[in-house]
Amino acid sequence: MTQVFSGDLECTKELLETILKRKDLTVIKSVTQLTIGNLFGRSVRLDIYANDAEGKQYDIEVQQNDSGAVPERARLNISLFDARLTTSGEKYTEMPETYIIFITSNDVLKGGLPIYTIERTIQETGALFKDKAHIVYVNGSYRGNDDIGWLMHDFNKCSKNSSTSSGGEMNCTSEHICSKKSL
């Protein structure tokens, strides 16, 4: 499934714009299966890594198993993502805005919503912490009559109509997912 997005800037743009409900993205890079190594512990392999013209960085994870989308995995991905994106001497305020997006087969957060946007908040005031790190979960079982519902329908159609590789990833073509006709 993720190979659909490798180098396909328009397809990646369409996916991100649908999930983030934006229409102003300019994706300048899309790579699949990017490994972020960690000398001191666990490394991660990003299903889809992308960045846009504003310098925002995206990690999109396509998960068929609920166990692959636990909150602790989002925490690990965001920490290694940040470590990879920073340089020695860089001001903290210059860190790029990051998005970790999990597209899951099921409603792993069990709230019946199509999308869950997780932002850190100051508990005593309820104000946003504004650390420029965002986590988004997309409920793959959602079938509403809207852009997210249609996108998840297409993801599900790919899953059912194609073989599954040994890694548990769905195999599909860009016409299945990234076609204005199907969205």
Spans of features found by a protein language model:
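Elongated, amphipathic alpha-helical interaction scaffolds
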Residues: M1-L183
